[in-house]
Amino acid sequence: MLPYQDKVGAFYKDNARANSTKLSLVTEGHGGRRPPYLLFVLLILLVGILALLAITGVRFHQVSTSNMEFSRLLKEDMEKSEAVHHQVIDVLTPLFKIIGDEIGLRLPQKLNEIKQFILQKTNFFNPNREFDFRDLHWCINPPSTVKVNFTNYCESIGIRKAIASAANPILLSALSGGRGDIFPPHRCSGATTSVGKVFPLSVSLSMSLISRTSEVINMLTAISDGVYGKTYLLVPDDIEREFDTREIRVFEIGFIKRWLNDMPLLQTTNYMVLPKNSKAKVCTIAVGELTLASLCVEESTVLLYHDSSGSQDGILVVTLGIFWATPMDHIEEVIPVAHPSMKKIHITNHRGFIKDSIATWMVPALASEKQEEQKGCLESACQRKTYPMCNQASWEPFGGRQLPSYGRLTLPLDASVDLQLNISFTYGPVILNGDGMDYYESPLLNSGWLTIPPKDGTISGLINKAGRGDQFTVLPHVLTFAPRESSGNCYLPIQTSQIRDRDVLIESNIVVLPTQSIRYVIATYDISRSDHAIVYYVYDPIRTISYTHPFRLTTKGRPDFLRIECFVWDDNLWCHQFYRFEADIANSTTSVENLVRIRFSCNR
């Protein structure tokens, strides 16, 4: 039997396996040369891979661009949605509320007013009393049953309407920022700062007179709804010899216009100089409805006679229109009409206002009817003699134990009636300072703010609410208190002490700003600093906050007169100030008039 190796060798001898070695060599020899079609396939495969990579890159770029565009569109849609949300919440919602108020509240009221107007006009055709019409069309063809004083009436009404039409564009620009809030926001997290600046009055008549070395004294200014008025005594220089008398009474009126950088400019449009020997040593002033009105007397205390026992002194009435040479420019002496119990009135520096063609002022008055009531108030309050005023032996301005009441002077300026000065009186908080009462218009109907200035640093001024209608009342509002010992309607002004602050040489009048909520301003001439200064104090009694700002002076002296009048302009406080002082070095008297601006801001 053959061994295993021999069997294998014998098997391969008869088969192709025997030549396997040779075949293997031949196969290796042919594999070193690759066929061309294989290289072509590889090339196509490489090109395909590159094409796929290029397509992938292009698609990736397109997707990135699409995502960016989608993000941009989404952001725009979000901004539009936010704008729509803002319009709905901040604009449409208040607008709908206003529309609801107009439809639900004001529209019925207006319809009722229209109804009353129609009823009133229809009743005119069958009047049962004498009527006074204010419509121009009644001048053309009035009903025969109507009795109207037509002397210069129609002409005056036409002129007034023409003047109002010409003045309205100027007033609208001035009133655009005249009712804003001068104070920083209520929730001010940082400190509140104030910045002040002084401006000259370059086109004011009084400034031109002062610049010519003429002396101006006792200036009284009133500002109302974009119109200002002044009255003062002018003492011409002896060298010029332009006037025949030593003192000339001057009135001027004009607009408050916007000037450079929207600052207010007091531009004189009309003025009047009273002739010599006129009874115009002491004058009041009232401004409103494009008109200035003034009451002038020779002596401050005016006696009132109600029978033939005495000769009643007349009061000089001066009216001045906003433009030159109009029927509003008028001078006339009138006899006041007062209640029989009134004995005297005291006229000094009084500022009033004109509303509904009626000029109104407040003055101290002496009336026998209210004496016992006022004395009873003092006696009950002074039982313990804890108040400084309890030791007073004489009361201003009438002297002795004669306690003054509140007098109201009203002067209708309607062209259809003759000038008549009516005097009424009432009782109110005790008056300690008889020199000066001012009356400011209030946003409340038929009322105003009556102010009495402080005095000697010991008597604080006070602010009362005074009625303007038929029912004349004076109610305490600020800087008064009801003593514990008294009962009923008894109020006293705040009296600090009998020791005067020696650093405060003089105090100004109290000015109530024409804002919705009451704010008031007062100024003092202060010498507590190295430089003399006029310091302004601004108060908000509702929020119980106050601000101060000093204006340093370049001169030093002893002042004898300080008067301010303030208004709001573009949310800033502006004040016209006039002060007169005797210089320490030159030993001469100097008058200064200018505008000051105070801007309050919040440092958050």
From Swiss-Prot:
GO biological process terms on file: symbiont entry into host cell; virion attachment to host cell
Transmembrane segments: 38-58
SUPFAM superfamilies: Sialidases
Glycosylation sites (chain numbering): N149, N422, N587
Record note on what altering S528A does: Partial loss of fusion activity
Domain of life: Viruses
This protein's record includes keyword Translocase: no
Topology term for the membrane: Single-pass type II membrane protein
Topological region Virion surface: 59-604
GO CC annotation terms, alphabetical: host cell plasma membrane; membrane; viral envelope; virion membrane
Result, substituting H532A: No effect on fusion activity
Effect of Y491A: Loss of fusion activity
Effect of F551S: Complete loss of fusion activity
InterPro entries xrefs: Hemagglutn/HN, Sialidase_sf
Positions on the Intravirion side per record topology: 1-37
Assembly behavior: Binds canine SLAMF1 at the cell surface.
This protein's name: Hemagglutinin glycoprotein
Top-level taxonomy: Viruses, Riboviria, Orthornavirae, Negarnaviricota, Haploviricotina
